[in-house]
Amino acid sequence: MTHTPVLLKEMLSLLSPQDGGIYVDATFGAGGYSKAILESADCKVYAIDRDETVTKFYDDLSVRYPDRIKLFIEKFSNIKNLLDSNNIEGIDGIVFDIGVSSMQLDNGDRGFSFLHDGPLDMSMDNSSYINASTFVNALREEEIANTIYNYGGERHSRKIARAIVNARKKKTIKTTFELADIVRSVVFRGKSKIDPATRTFQAIRIWVNDELGELEKGIKAASEILSENGKLIVVTFHSLEDRIVKTFFKDLCATDCKTFSLLNKKVIEASIEEVSANPRSRSAKLRAIQRLS
């Protein structure tokens, strides 16, 4: 499978890696950002990912760039404690590419996608006791409806929640295809190109992994460990994520002490050419700040 990093040129242009610099790729994934940073300068990259299956991508990079990259299997919300405990300092830049990766979506066994049949999991660290099965088989109808509405923007959330509860009364809901069919039984596509199950799956994934809470904690911790002139760059794919980043960056840069400055006043989005080549980039938004002192 080919992994295409989103907004790669724009990220590199803002980060501007320098020889001798120290950078953190807080969402390593398939290593697209890390690889590009290592190619751009004679620098060092510390990579973080909560999904241990990414080690196969790390192994390739560590052979190509010995002693210049190190991977930690950890949630990025723990970035400050992780780097402090390993005596890593002098951070010149931190990049985040938020959301589920293509390799997770394409692996049916992970249960992220309604396009591939598999167990209802959706856990990014592959070891959580809370997963998508917990959500559909254990939560109250009202909790299911509210989550699907709040995290997925699904206006049919109450119908979907009722259908899920009715279905689980007959038998445990076990697979992604079962769940998708339940959603499609009460929400019809009509002329829309978007599958009726899309928003529900997105909402459940966000809930399972506490993605919004992780993002809030992660970018706050990252902002605290940047060196002077260090840059924090975040790419999001969901309006709720972008709102969190936009608000946090605005608040940081609005303080009287002027510790931070916005690197891009206007949000950066993928070009028409990139969207055509990589449809995943369609909803991507990049925001960046720099520590001044």
UniProtKB/Swiss-Prot annotation:
UniProt keyword S-adenosyl-L-methionine present:
yes
Reactions listed under catalytic activity: cytidine(1402) in 16S rRNA + S-adenosyl-L-methionine = N(4)-methylcytidine(1402) in 16S rRNA + S-adenosyl-L-homocysteine + H(+)
Q: Give one GO term, molecular function aspect.
A: rRNA (cytosine-N4-)-methyltransferase activity
Note the superkingdom of the native organism: Bacteria
One family from Pfam that matches here is Methyltransf_5
Q: Which GO terms describe its biological process?
A: rRNA base methylation
InterPro entries given in the database record: RsmH, SAM-dep_MeTrfase_MraW_recog, SAM-dependent_MTases_sf
Q: Which positions does UniProt annotate for S-adenosyl-L-methionine binding?
A: 31-33, 49, 76, 97, 104
| Subcellular locations according to the entry | Cytoplasm
The answer to whether keyword Transmembrane applies is no
Q: Which UniProt keywords apply?
A: Cytoplasm, Methyltransferase, rRNA processing, S-adenosyl-L-methionine, Transferase
Q: What is its EC number?
A: 2.1.1.199
Gene Ontology CC terms: cytoplasm
Q: What class of enzyme is it?
A: transferase
Q: Which NCBIfam families match?
A: 16S rRNA (cytosine(1402)-N(4))-methyltransferase RsmH
- Family under the similarity heading: Belongs to the methyltransferase superfamily. RsmH family.
Extract the HAMAP family matched here.
16SrRNA_methyltr_H
Annotated function? Specifically methylates the N4 position of cytidine in position 1402 (C1402) of 16S rRNA.
Q: What is this protein called?
A: Ribosomal RNA small subunit methyltransferase H
